[in-house]
Amino acid sequence: MAKLTKRARLIAEKVEATKLYSVEEAVALLSELSTVKFKESIDVSVNLGVDPRKSDQVVRGSTVLPHGAGKDVRVAVFAQGANAEAAKEAGADVVGFEDLAEQVKAGNLDFDVVIASPDAMRIVGQLGQVLGPRGLMPNPKVGTVTPDVATAVRNAKAGQARYRTDKNGIIHAAVGSIEFAADAIRGNLEALLTDLRRAKPASSKGVYLRKVTLSSTMGPGLQIDLGALNSTK
């Protein structure tokens, strides 16, 4: 049998596999178990009572995190005229139209979020093979195709969790960093869960929010006690 690393032994000693943790307990334990030299994110996985094989049960959207995401977000905006100026004033890092499309085609993708005004989609639509695989393709369902590009930029800069159910009906999102206080993680998590409840498909039957798990980038997953969350009541 292979020897456990010091970190693996610590996790095995500290984590109770069957326990339902409060957010505060989970954040404290993940912080205690964090031994890496970079700032880990705090991630959440939410198992939803949906059938992802059915198109009307795909849950997709975004949540503005009230306490931010804990990282700097670089935003690119496809817009022209007044929209371009509004995007710049709102803090966009890169703003352009055909010129920005050429940068993308050349592989210059030094940004985390792409926003587009509706009139720019005739150009952005041609970039699907580049932006799509990187999760950067603008989409109206998550608020990144919008006539109000300034608000979209401010939301992205403030910190947003974007999500879409995977093939198993699970949502994955970051809700902060390991340096956040527990109440900030709780606030972000409850904002996300509130939006997920609002996005419940009409055809979804039975229990909708089935399981919530918090983890850090390199840490274990800790199941959260749903009964202790205001957004699940």
Swiss-Prot record:
GO-annotated biological processes: regulation of translation; translation
Keyword tRNA-binding: yes
Alphabetized InterPro entries for the sequence: Ribosom_uL1_bac-type (IPR005878), Ribosomal_uL1 (IPR002143), Ribosomal_uL1-like (IPR023674), Ribosomal_uL1/biogenesis (IPR028364), Ribosomal_uL1_3-a/b-sand (IPR016095), Ribosomal_uL1_CS (IPR023673)
Domain of life of the native organism: Bacteria
SUPFAM superfamilies to which the protein is assigned, alphabetical: Ribosomal protein L1 (SSF56808)
Keywords: Repressor, Ribonucleoprotein, Ribosomal protein, RNA-binding, rRNA-binding, Translation regulation, tRNA-binding
GO cellular component entries: cytosolic large ribosomal subunit
Any Pfam family the entry gives: Ribosomal_L1
CDD domains xrefs: Ribosomal_L1 (cd00403)
Gene3D superfamilies found in the cross-reference section: 3.30.190.20, 3.40.50.790
MF GO annotations: rRNA binding; structural constituent of ribosome; tRNA binding
The protein's assembly and partners: Part of the 50S ribosomal subunit.
Family (UniProt): Belongs to the universal ribosomal protein uL1 family.
PANTHER family, sorted: 54S RIBOSOMAL PROTEIN L1, MITOCHONDRIAL, LARGE RIBOSOMAL SUBUNIT PROTEIN UL1M
Function: Binds directly to 23S rRNA. The L1 stalk is quite mobile in the ribosome, and is involved in E site tRNA release.
Protein name: Large ribosomal subunit protein uL1
Organism: Marinomonas sp. (strain MWYL1)
Gene behind the chain: rplA
